[in-house]
Each structure stands twice: as structure tokens, then as C-alpha cells.
Amino acid sequence: MSRSIKKGVFLHKSLFLKIKNNKLENIKTWSRNSTIIPDMIGININIHNGKLFKKVFIVEDMIGCKLGEFSFTRKFKSHSKKIKRKKK
């Protein structure tokens, strides 16, 4: 379900202030639900995934997405494949 247009996008207040003040430095944030806005283009943002901070460089294609979409919280682990052996 999408967010109402009259409410606008969500951006954490402290994250917004850091973007306005520090244009070129790395910004560390725990706010995964903040929306990427055009002012963020070209900034490195360290997004917390619950254990570590993952460094993400913001580009134009990311505008309108949430920060949490680029820092996965779960590690993908696949099952091992069976190896077919040649018969002698």
C-alpha cells in the first residue's frame, strides 16, 4: 500500500539536517524507512542493517526508494548442490 500524496515523503529530521550541513562527507544513519530525495544525489550514506553499516552511494535512479532497500538485513544462504560423479 502506497503512502498518501497529501502526507508527502518521510525523511527523518536529523538525517535531513545532516544532508543540508555536510554535503560531501559520509553520513551514518539508522533510519532505513527514510525516502531518498534529490538533495541526496552524490552522497555516501552508511545504512545500518541491524549488525553493520553498509556504505551506499546515492545515484539518480534511487530517488523515491527507501534507504532500507539497499541494505539487506538477512543473509541469503542457499542449499549446496549435489555433485554428479562419473561412473567408471
Curated annotation (Swiss-Prot):
GO terms for molecular function: rRNA binding; structural constituent of ribosome. The keyword rRNA-binding applies. GO terms for cellular component: cytoplasm; small ribosomal subunit. Pfam families: Ribosomal_S19 (PF00203). Keywords: Ribonucleoprotein, Ribosomal protein, RNA-binding, rRNA-binding. GO terms for biological process: ribosomal small subunit assembly; translation. SUPFAM superfamilies: Ribosomal protein S19 (SSF54570). Protein S19 forms a complex with S13 that binds strongly to the 16S ribosomal RNA. PANTHER family: RIBOSOMAL PROTEIN S19P FAMILY MEMBER, SMALL RIBOSOMAL SUBUNIT PROTEIN US19M. Belongs to the universal ribosomal protein uS19 family. This is Small ribosomal subunit protein uS19. It comes from Carsonella ruddii (strain PV). The lineage of its organism: Bacteria, Pseudomonadati, Pseudomonadota, Gammaproteobacteria, Oceanospirillales. The gene is rpsS.
